[in-house]
Amino acid sequence: MSASVSSKSTVVSSIISGLLSIVLFGTLRFCSEWFNDSQLRVLLGGYLFSWVFILSLTCVSNAEMVVFGQDFQAKLLPEIIFCLSLTVAAAGLVHRVCATTSVLFSLVGLYFLNRISTKYYSVQVPSVDAPTTRKGGKKFK
């Protein structure tokens, strides 16, 4: 019962984050002239595009968890690079500086997401101490 509930919540989370990223991109693209008016608005656009990155990464990661199982994790090369390049291309349609600042804000957001997920979902592996005695052979000083 709990596996199906977890799977349903993962599907719902994937759909909601995908829809929010599309709506946020559409809003940012529709208001691109407003973001080009001042430097502060361009920085705000980069910050909002970092949310597009986080939402699209959540959508992709949750969709992969549905397909490949609950223990599947997003890796750097396929998922994160794909979502980041997609976000940078979308931010470049609004303003070039939006693309640059979205990369910086996205990396900061990814760092904090990694810290939060490590805190809550990491499994502690007990360390194994190496034996201190040697069997035969030369002894080094």
Swiss-Prot record:
GO aspect biological process, one term: protein N-linked glycosylation
Domain of life: Eukaryota
Keyword Transmembrane: yes
Pfam families per the UniProt record, alphabetical: Keratin_assoc
Family designation: Belongs to the KRTCAP2 family.
The protein's assembly and partners: Component of the oligosaccharyltransferase (OST) complex.
Protein name (record): Protein KRTCAP2 homolog
